[in-house]
Amino acid sequence: MADFKLSTSIRYDPILLDAPKHEDLDTTDWNRKVASPWYMLDYHRDRMLKAATHFGWKSAVEKIEGLEGLKRLEDFLTPFTRSAGLKPHRVKILLDEDGTLKHEFSPAQQTSLNNMFPSYLPAPEEAKEAAVNISARATPGKLPEYEIYVDSAATSHTEFTHYKTTKRQMYDDARKRLHLALADPKEVLLVNPTDGSIMEGSFTTPFFWRNNRWVTPPVSQGFQEGNGSGGNEGTTRRWALERGLAIEEKVMARSLQNGEECWISNGVRGFIFGRIKI
């Protein structure tokens, strides 16, 4: 048995039950077709399936592949929905090599459907005149505002930065260097040691404003050593790229400016506004 588990952290939130009623929201197929309290469950399944396939975990693949696998994952989570009540939660799903599923949970902050499924990411204040005028209805809120720092050390690109697993020491170390607690409204950006580009956040995907558009560090399709920024194939990252909210582009750590506006996202909190702190 491997000494790690595959993981993905998903949002449980009863307000998602209303998502299919909101025609202005461009959700995933899961949240469009199913009245479900689970945020992008289909994308969370897909990321675990890719990881299980990469590591050659046949039993884990069989557990969650196909429509039957997605249903098994939903059924596994159903007992939690009966006991969680109306408050949002962060639920970490763990998948073992033998196909065993487990979960851990904790309370999550309130957020809106607009921050889970934004029609666009608002341009920075200084760039509004240059940006394309977008009359979107699902505008994400900018509160709470996160402080975004750049790690002082580099982090190696490995299969454990590409795929989300319980091997997270590199992310914990990055937060420790800045003395960041998990509850702090703060994030730290990891830096690729090869070229000094931004890889990802310790628990989020970052988006930066470059040439009048939002960009996010490139990630290879499947783990390829030396290709891409070295970051994770996140669920909200995938969603944003598929809908044209951002494109992939390398962003050098040295290009970031103090006070620069940015967005970060993940599968628990949706899209969050932030500012770079140098």
Task: Kindly give the residue locations of the regions a language model identified.
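Helix-start/capping segments and mature chain N-termini
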Residues: M1-F80, K87-R90, L95-I278
